[in-house]
């Protein structure tokens, strides 16, 4: 079966969507006996077009000759707090996204919470499948203590401090303001934010956050956008991942932290419950976040329990299990839409 993977995610650095794209493509490429994969091929001679981003050039390539699969990494209702766009333009963009999703034959969601949102925009439930993100254990894994000490020197991170890591684009929805406030309230800990402005000046809150970065508390370090191949080092030098986002999808950063067996603290959002099984630290305010971090720092039993929860999540989203999931999915939907004479069934 020939699959054309279409995506522009890797053209913008520092996006979780790009990480998810690379993990999924690499996984399918390993199944050489079943699938022949190309990326952004201009040819139309494929059985499946698997579209990862909503670019117009990919939408226009959807047709009746092949199966069109749309990978949904966000829904319009969750598209607030990332980019600062005029209200009319934002409305037009959301309508465009809805029509693009409806044009696809099949939809894949990375979070089951999206399913009801997609049904609201008249996408049939029978054409929606939930397949979670995953992170390869070969790329993100615990390192030896001696290596971690050397890495802390490399990144100028104190060896004897409790290290709190935040990751992602600096924008309103990521809760960056709360991250900074929690850092101010805990001067005995060191806070690191790895990430920057992937979309430049159109990032929501760009001017405010540029100014904030110039006046960070003394116990906070900002690392600009880091290539993903070095992010395993960053996760290993930290003690806990802290993600105070107001809106999320299925964060690759959480899966990466889990692979390194680090506890993680998040805002108490409903969308985490079905995918993380409530095996995580949570809070809803600067005070609650601070209390959780203090407990993780001072209570070794609690810390180890939370680290075990991360191991559980890491093992659950297993590459080998998901390899079978993807193989079964492609075969199932292709057989669903095509008859024996290769004529596409219009449903």
Q: What would you call each of these model-derived segments?
A:
Residues 225, 233-238:
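Short alpha-helical donor nucleotide-sugar binding micro-motif in glycosyltransferases
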Residues 205-229:
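Nucleotide-activated donor-binding/catalytic signature segment of Leloir-type glycosyltransferases, i.e.
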Residues 158-174, 180-184, 192:
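Conserved donor-binding/catalytic core segment of Leloir-type glycosyltransferases
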Residues 277-288, 294-300:
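Conserved acidic donor-binding segment of nucleotide-sugar-dependent glycosyltransferases
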Residues 190-208:
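Glycosyltransferase donor-sugar binding loop
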Residues 246:
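Aromatic "clamp/platform" in nucleotide-sugar-dependent glycosyltransferases that forms part
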Residues 88-107, 210-213:
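Membrane-proximal helix-turn-helix segments that form the acceptor-binding/catalytic region
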């Amino acid at each position: 079966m020939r699959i054309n993977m279409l995506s522009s995610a890797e053209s913008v650095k520092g996006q979780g969507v790009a990480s998810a794209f690379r993990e999924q493509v690499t996984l399918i490429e390993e199944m050489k006996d079943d699938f022949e994969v190309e990326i952004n091929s201009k040819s139309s001679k494929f059985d499946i077009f698997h579209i990862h981003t909503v670019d117009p050039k990919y939408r226009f390539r959807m047709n009746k000759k092949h199966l069109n699969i749309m990978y949904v990494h966000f829904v319009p209702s969750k598209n607030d707090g990332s980019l600062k766009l005029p209200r009319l333009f934002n409305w037009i963009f959301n309508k465009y996204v809805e029509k693009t999703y409806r044009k696809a034959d099949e939809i894949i969601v990375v979070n089951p919470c999206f399913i009801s949102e997609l049904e609201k925009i008249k996408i049939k439930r029978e054409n929606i499948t939930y397949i979670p993100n995953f992170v390869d254990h070969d790329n993100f894994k615990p390192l030896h203590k001696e290596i971690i000490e050397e890495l802390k020197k490399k990144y100028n991170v104190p060896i004897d401090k409790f290290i709190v890591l935040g990751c992602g684009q600096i924008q309103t929805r990521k809760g960056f303001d709360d991250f900074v406030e929690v850092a101010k309230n805990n001067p005995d800990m060191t806070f690191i934010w790895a990430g920057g402005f992937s979309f430049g000046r159109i990032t929501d809150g760009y001017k405010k956050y540029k100014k904030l970065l110039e006046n960070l508390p003394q116990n906070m370090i900002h690392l600009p956008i880091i290539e993903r191949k070095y992010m395993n080092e960053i996760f290993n030098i930290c003690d806990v991942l802290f993600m105070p986002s107001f809106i999320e999808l299925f964060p690759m950063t959480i899966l990466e932290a889990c692979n390194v067996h680090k506890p993680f603290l998040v805002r108490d959002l409903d969308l985490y419950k079905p995918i993380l099984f409530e095996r995580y630290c949570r809070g809803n305010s600067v005070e609650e976040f601070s209390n959780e971090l203090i407990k993780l720092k001072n209570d070794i039993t609690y810390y180890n329990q939370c680290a075990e929860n991360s191991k559980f999540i890491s093992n659950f989203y297993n590459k080998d299990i998901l390899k079978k999931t993807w193989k079964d999915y492609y075969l199932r939907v292709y057989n669903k839409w095509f008859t024996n004479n290769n004529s596409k069934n219009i449903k």
